[in-house]
Amino acid sequence: MAWSADYMLSSREDIEVVRYNTVADLVMALRFKKIDKAAMERPFAVEVLNCVDGLRIIDETIATDGLVFAVNNEREDLLNELNEFFRRFKESKEKKELFERLNSTEGYEYHKIENAKGNRMLSVGLPTDAYPYSYIDFESGDYAGSDLEVITMFANEYGYTLEFTPGIFTTIEIGIGEGEFDVAIGSFCDAAREDAEVSEVFMMSDVYMEHEIVYIEVEDFNSLKVISPLD
């Protein structure tokens, strides 16, 4: 179960939620019938199917969440700029094209955007374990992801030079709460907004893109096998 799916489904009384720390463990649970289905964001579900034979996505969308950025509590000016940018971005051809790539049955293809390097600095917390939103491309060794595309488009329009601080999602979430950087990207979801507002550890931007939560299940136990690394 992915983080967004966890928020969206934990309150449901008609299902029993079991959490796994790795995709490999989750697939093993499916294989040995410890669970009936796995819930996750559609883009990540596509990637899992590209790594494991014998699984399928159940087409019905079980929930819809929104992608957001987490913003330093001291940077209300930045929050306002991001929300202004997102209002335009949501209606743009760039957003439509990115959404299509994220939800492609072939899997997400990263399109690198060069940072124009403006006269203002923007420090960005970047999880390297949040595929397809932010991660390290193991072929090039560079940062990649859909959130990286979006923050770079924003930075170029508003005159920022990007400075990245990498880490796993947990450390990035802690870091933005402690004011270590201006903004954090990489799979922050609108479903967590209430918790963020109550704890007051950071602010959340408006939603810039919706995403679907879907189930995956075993289609054929006889052909179930890993064909490429999962985690």
Residue ranges and their predicted role:
Residues M1, Y7-M8, R12-M28, K37, ...:
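Extracytoplasmic small-molecule ligand-binding "clamshell" domains
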Residues M1-W3, R42-T64, N73, L148, ...:
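Acidic, polar ligand-binding/catalytic clefts
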Residues S10-D14, R31-I35, N50, E74, ...:
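Sec-exported extracytoplasmic/periplasmic mature domains
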